[in-house]
């Protein structure tokens, strides 16, 4: 199969139609809940490896404004591009989340898409004290993703799962993010 030449051109219109430089004026205060993360980050991942043993890896994370500044999209890559194990399931992941503020529920709707491991999950996110908590309870296992220890140049992301309808939660993984400085 041949890829059409138009699709491979960097100026094909897709990037310009998707990405914007900042938030939309409407709900700008609410948009900054995730807008504060716009930029590039280095990740230190810790979790359980494919063999069931504790594992660590480094990766990368990129946040940007999309869809007219009404949403924030991110790309999580662990291990990072060019690192051993990149793109090799089940331990690696390379996925994207699109999040937008929905004033009808005063919360963020969020969808995670991760083709390496064939995952799609929907979440609802809200501020929780100084943290941000995202909950996915439409299918098993239920998931809780938390942004915590949030500062201008670092944060921690934690993932937990419940296999009993939310009665108990098990730690799955954690990522420490450090903002990249302009190079």
Describe these PLM feature segments.
Residues 67-68, 151-153:
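Residue-level recognition of beta-strand termini and adjacent short loop/turns
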């Amino acid at each position: 199969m041949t890829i059409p030449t138009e699709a491979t051109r960097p100026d094909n219109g897709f990037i310009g139609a998707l990405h914007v430089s900042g938030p939309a004026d409407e709900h700008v205060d609410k948009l900054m809940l995730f807008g504060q993360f716009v930029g590039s980050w280095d990740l230190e991942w810790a979790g359980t490896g494919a063999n069931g043993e504790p594992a660590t890896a480094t990766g990368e994370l990129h946040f940007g404004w999309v869809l007219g500044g009404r949403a924030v999209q991110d790309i999580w890559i662990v291990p990072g591009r060019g690192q051993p194990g990149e793109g090799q399931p089940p331990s690696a992941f390379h996925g994207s989340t699109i999040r937008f503020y929905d004033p009808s529920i005063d919360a963020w709707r969020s969808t995670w898409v991760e083709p390496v491991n064939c995952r799609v999950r929907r979440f609802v996110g809200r501020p929780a004290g100084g943290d941000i908590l995202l909950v996915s309870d439409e299918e098993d296992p239920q998931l809780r993703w938390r942004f915590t220890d949030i500062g201008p140049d670092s944060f921690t992301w934690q993932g937990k799962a419940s296999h009993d309808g939310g009665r108990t939660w098990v730690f799955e993984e954690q990522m420490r993010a450090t903002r990249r400085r302009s190079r």
